[in-house]
A protein has these predicted regions:
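Hydrophobic Val/Ile/Leu positions in short beta-strands of Rossmann-like dinucleotide-binding domains
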Residues: 5-6, 71, 156
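Short beta-strand and adjoining strand-loop segment in the mid-core
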Residues: 107-115, 120, 145-162
Length: 221
């Protein structure tokens, strides 16, 4: 499975790229500059030299050629980036992972985008793409450390059944992670906003906690 990450040179994009490559996926780290994307890929390959990560850099446009595309650009630029690539993203699963947040004093607060959530704004920017939301609650530092096991549920939301299924399958390939169907994109507003709460807890507890849902019945039961 090939993964393309738009804005893959930032902390979240780099972290996800390394983690997905560590489980055998081929990952294209996209950037506005293909050279910068390759610099980041080289940095990660060198950092984890013993793991033979299949990482390469590219422009964002080339990253769109992957089977699944992840939008990891900063939240305020994500819709614009996706809109510029909308034709290339037609029919593809596009995972929005950014959170609209800003710092107020020592706290993080959620920004409510005009469309209600960043996921919805990304879907509007590429109306023929199959947009899902995922990976919002995984701390980048923990995700980036391949020697640190993960223990997290990942809430997945989408208006497209196929996108939900594909995204959950992707999440489930990461050891320690479990993809959970959280419903339609209307859930994204709450999912994204909760990240501010989680970051606040982690700051106060000096931790890198994610989330786990308890009491869930097995599917089909």
């Amino acid at each position: 499975m090939d993964i393309g990450i738009l804005g893959g040179t930032g902390p979240a994009g780099k972290a996800l790229a390394a983690r997905l490559a560590s489980v055998g996926m081929s990952v294209s780290i996209g950037s506005r500059s293909a050279e910068r994307g390759e610099e980041t890929a080289t940095e990660l390959r060198d950092k984890w030299a013993g793991r033979a990560l299949d990482l390469h850099g590219s422009s964002n446009a080339v990253a769109c050629e992957a089977d699944i595309v992840v939008a990891a650009t900063p939240w305020d630029g994500a819709p614009h980036t996706v809109a510029a690539l909308a034709d290339r993203l037609e029919g593809k699963v596009v995972i929005s992972m950014a959170n609209a947040l800003f710092k107020v004093g020592d706290d993080m607060e959620a920004v409510v985008p005009a469309r209600g959530s960043l996921c919805v704004a990304v879907q509007d920017a590429a109306p023929r793409a199959l947009v899902s939301g995922a990976f919002h609650h995984l701390p980048a530092r923990g995700l980036a450390n391949l020697e640190e096991p993960l223990d997290a549920d990942v809430l997945v939301c989408s208006d497209h059944v196929a996108a939900t299924k594909t995204t959950i399958e992707l999440v489930d390939r990461i050891p320690g992670c479990r993809g959970i169907d959280a419903g339609s994109l209307s859930a994204a507003a709450a999912i994204e906003a909760f990240t501010a709460v989680l970051i606040g807890v982690n700051i106060r507890r000096r931790s890198h906690a994610s989330i786990r849902l308890t009491g869930l019945r097995a599917e089909g039961v």
